[in-house]
């Protein structure tokens, strides 16, 4: 890949998990961002231990050579919470803009089971036509609000939500306007479909509307257990569903090849939530960085 096209970041979820705060509760913000920099990353997303004061956060990141590239935002358009979502989005947008980010990664969390004990494969929400209409209207509005600050809105397809499968990604992309984008996540698509082919098909199909990339690997044996025992998304996380690139079943070279073929310019972010007591965050950050350097050449 062309180094000038790619910026490489890592998410703090490997140090402290926002959905399971007890995972990594002992890890401090300063430790997290210092280890990111030591491992060779120049950007990150935002975790629950990050200072929310822009000046304070900027200083702590600047001295480490780290910048914010995105932060998760939950939308609830399908549930009818349009105005509340928009008001919260404006605050989120303004924070990210002040931090220099260009992309806002959103997830439609209406009826999501990702934070519950429900079986992630059998009990995920299914949206009807009215749901999709509400979602499209909401995301089209977010795109306009993001554009006011020169930013782009992207949707993060995610296990346990109404936009998980390739078919649901297709529906999302067909109902929203062209100025609404996609956050591609290798791990969530592989997890959902259980194969590399389906994941790569989504990447290539929508490459021109992908504005942010999450790199996460998957442990097949854990996914098999999640399916066999009807486990929840978070139970899978604790058992080790996800890991850094190069440590699981996904072959990332075809991903990098597609991104290079279509001249993708932007961030690739290692986002691999694990139990830090079992997978030392710094060591795994180094492992992922080494693999990306060797396979992608960046």
From Swiss-Prot:
The entry's keywords: Cobalt, Lyase, Manganese
UniProt-recorded name of the protein: Inosose dehydratase
Recorded family membership: Belongs to the IolE/MocC family.
GO molecular function, one term: myo-inosose-2 dehydratase activity
Cofactor entry: glutathione; Co(2+); Mn(2+)
Any one biological process term the GO annotation gives: inositol catabolic process
Primary enzyme class: lyase
Organism: Glaesserella parasuis serovar 5 (strain SH0165)
Pfam family, any one: AP_endonuc_2
The protein's Enzyme Commission number: 4.2.1.44
Catalytic activity: scyllo-inosose = 3D-3,5/4-trihydroxycyclohexane-1,2-dione + H2O
